[in-house]
């Protein structure tokens, strides 16, 4: 089954054909680590994690290389460090650790590589040097700038005509720029800011060159897939493309920088893009204190990835209910002593995901599989139940769902005090049943029901779960 992906460059859905099926490469722009990331920052994380999983299923886990960078040199990091009176590295490492913890809680696999700007400085300086040597960059007043005239296809990725590109440049154009569209590759550091040595004087890199250098060092150029949010198409990815090609080839002609460009839509709140500058944000760090990460992942994938998605409490509640439904049928299908079913992916789920990651269709297929499994349970068809369990688990696992035991899922809504109370009541109930004190056993079951706890008795003992909300 052919994987089809929508390519921003061609404005069309294309069959995915990697340069080398034995070495499939993908790069996605990662975080600037100056604060806790909001849930909108994690939409690309979850979307491209899904693509990473699909690629690994297609080509093999050892044949897919995924790099997601970390920007740990930035004015916002500098300001945060100055406010706290600590080195910038302390701020960057703190929020990188929090970001990675949130990503894992959302079910995102760790990327193969997570390069940092501070650890790629030699490669950055080297790439700028090649651009200067190729006549695609020039030094001016301590800065080094990319000359957009060196790349004839500048504007092709974003589809913007020349006049729009010029109008989109800063109103106050620096006097040392030859063209308003030219952008900074290297700049002098201000007093108190971190700086690195370079042939053009001490300073630090511009934003765009960082990604190109990290891609080249981690994966090599060209890569198969370059991903990120739709807001990065221009200027960031447009500039990456221009400098990446020109660093490798004089006159801006030659190999492709990335074979496919993929971009996810905004996550909106109150019909505006979620943004710290606007103030309409929900931190993933805070949401994870209230909601299971798997439910947040479902919510993030509930819409087609290229379209905007409105983030609301209702969206999360619906995601939690959807997973409750799947976990419940999986729990009901489990019988002590049943043979473990080998997980496998249902063709309906595979077809949906291979159609440009059509997650709404894939989720609908999961519900169809769930209903079929429920029917097999009602018929008491052991073979069909075992097969259905394997089908549901394998299909959901490909999407990063049903990653835990049903009992763990249903108990995740209980705090430690409630868990201790339930376990104590179950122990009392077991003792009452052993003593044939049936009135007491029934009384305890009623107490558990009042706690919104459902008890399931089986040959291996009693298990419990939080009741599904009506």
UniProtKB/Swiss-Prot annotation:
One Gene Ontology biological process: cysteinyl-tRNA aminoacylation
Cofactor: Zn(2+)
GO MF annotation: an example: zinc ion binding
Position of sequence motif 'KMSKS' region: 273-277
Cofactor comment: Binds 1 zinc ion per subunit.
Main location: cytoplasm
Ligase as UniProt keyword: yes
Keyword set, alphabetical order: Aminoacyl-tRNA synthetase, ATP-binding, Cytoplasm, Ligase, Metal-binding, Nucleotide-binding, Protein biosynthesis, Zinc
Residues annotated for ATP binding in this entry: 276
GO cellular component assignments: cytosol
CDD domains, alphabetized: CysRS_core
Residues involved in Zn(2+) binding: 29, 211, 236, 240
Catalytic activity: tRNA(Cys) + L-cysteine + ATP = L-cysteinyl-tRNA(Cys) + AMP + diphosphate
Cellular compartments annotated: Cytoplasm
EC numbers for this chain: 6.1.1.16
Domain of life: Bacteria
Chain ranges for the short sequence motif 'HIGH' region as given in the UniProt record: 31-41
Subunit (UniProt): Monomer.
UniProt family annotation: Belongs to the class-I aminoacyl-tRNA synthetase family.
PANTHER family in the record: CYSTEINE--TRNA LIGASE, CYTOPLASMIC, CYSTEINYL-TRNA SYNTHETASE
Protein name, UniProt field: Cysteine--tRNA ligase
Organism: Phenylobacterium zucineum (strain HLK1)
Gene: cysS
């Amino acid at each position: 089954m052919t994987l089809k992906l929508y390519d921003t460059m061609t404005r069309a859905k294309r069959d995915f054909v990697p340069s080398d099926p034995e070495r499939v490469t993908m790069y996605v722009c990662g975080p600037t680590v100056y604060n806790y990331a909001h849930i909108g920052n994690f939409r690309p994380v979850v979307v491209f994690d899904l693509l990473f999983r699909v690629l690994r299923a297609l080509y093999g886990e050892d044949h897919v290389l995924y790099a997601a960078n970390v920007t740990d040199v930035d004015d916002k990091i500098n300001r945060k460090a100055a406010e706290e009176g600590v080195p910038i590295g302390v701020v960057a490492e703190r929020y990188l650790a929090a970001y990675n913890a949130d990503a894992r809680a959302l079910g995102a696999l760790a990327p193969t590589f997570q390069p940092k700007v501070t650890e790629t400085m030699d490669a950055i300086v080297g790439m700028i040097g090649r651009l200067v040597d190729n006549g695609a960059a020039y030094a001016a007043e301590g800065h080094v700038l990319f000359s957009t005239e060196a790349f004839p296809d500048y504007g092709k990725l974003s589809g913007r005509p020349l006049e729009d590109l010029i109008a989109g440049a800063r109103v106050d154009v620096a006097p040392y720029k030859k063209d308003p569209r030219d952008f900074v590759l290297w700049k002098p550091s201000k007093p108190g800011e971190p700086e690195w040595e370079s042939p053009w004087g001490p300073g630090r890199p511009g934003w765009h060159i960082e990604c190109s250098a990290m891609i080249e060092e981690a994966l090599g150029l060209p890569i198969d897939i370059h991903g990120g949010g739709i807001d990065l198409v221009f200027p960031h990815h447009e500039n990456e493309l221009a400098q990446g090609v020109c660093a490798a080839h004089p006159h801006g002609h030659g190999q492709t920088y990335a074979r496919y460009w993929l971009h996810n839509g905004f996550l909106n709140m109150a019909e505006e893009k979620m943004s710290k500058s606007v103030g309409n944000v929900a931190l993933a760090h805070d949401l994870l204190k209230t909601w299971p990460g798997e439910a947040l992942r479902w919510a993030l994938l509930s819409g087609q990835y290229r379209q905007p998605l409105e983030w609301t409490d209702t969206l999360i509640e619906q995601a939690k209910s959807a997973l409750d439904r799947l976990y419940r049928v999986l729990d009901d299908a489990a019988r002590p002593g049943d043979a473990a079913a080998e997980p496998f992916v249902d063709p309906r789920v595979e077809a949906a995901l291979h159609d440009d990651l059509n997650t709404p269709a894939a989720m609908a297929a999961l519900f169809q599989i769930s209903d079929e499994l429920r029917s097999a349970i009602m018929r008491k068809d052991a073979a069909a139940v075992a097969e259905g369990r394997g089908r549901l688990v394998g299909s959901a696992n490909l999407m990063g769902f049903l990653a835990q035991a049903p009992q763990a899922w249903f108990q995740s809504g209980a705090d430690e005090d409630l868990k201790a109370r339930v376990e104590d009541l179950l122990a009392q109930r077991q003792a009452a049943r052993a003593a044939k004190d049936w009135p007491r056993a029934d009384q305890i079951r009623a107490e558990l029901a009042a706690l919104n706890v459902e008890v399931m008795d089986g040959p291996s003992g009693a298990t419990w779960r939080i009741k599904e909300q009506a």
